[in-house]
Amino acid sequence: MRVWIDADACPRAARDQVVKFALKRGFEVVLVAGQAVARPNFACVKLIVVPSGPDAADDHLVEHAVPGELVICSDVPLADRLVKKGVAALDPRGREFDERNMGERLAVRNLFTDLREQGQVGGGQAPYSEKDRQAFANALDRILTRLSR
């Protein structure tokens, strides 16, 4: 089994959590980034730096991840592409992307993009919290168990 991480947008605490699970359960972790990021020094962790460009890391993830694997990403359009391909997708705050919720997740993302462009809302997500880390660990455990069956 393999877990892919969109490393450009994934909080370090979530990446570290995936590595912890990988060491316990014996799977490979592949960090995909548009620029060099810190790679934990374990044999189970691989770093792929893709050429810079719009959506280069996303395209690499969609091209190489296969059903039965998991991708950690915050990007809703990327998650939609992965789910359509049959690849499991989870955001770093513990929310799984699937066929049942993709339409709603895309609509909310598009609404907030439009509101930001019109200057009606500002800022971004709240800082990554202990509650987020715990929700992520629980969801990660649940999905890995499901995928290993």
Curated annotation (Swiss-Prot):
NCBIfam families per the UniProt record, alphabetical: PRK00124.1 (NF001095)
PANTHER family: UPF0178 PROTEIN YAII
Highest taxon above the source species: Bacteria
CDD domains hit by this protein: PIN_YqxD-like
Name of the protein this chain belongs to: UPF0178 protein Pmen_0294
Family: Belongs to the UPF0178 family.
Pfam families with a match to the protein in the record: DUF188 (PF02639)
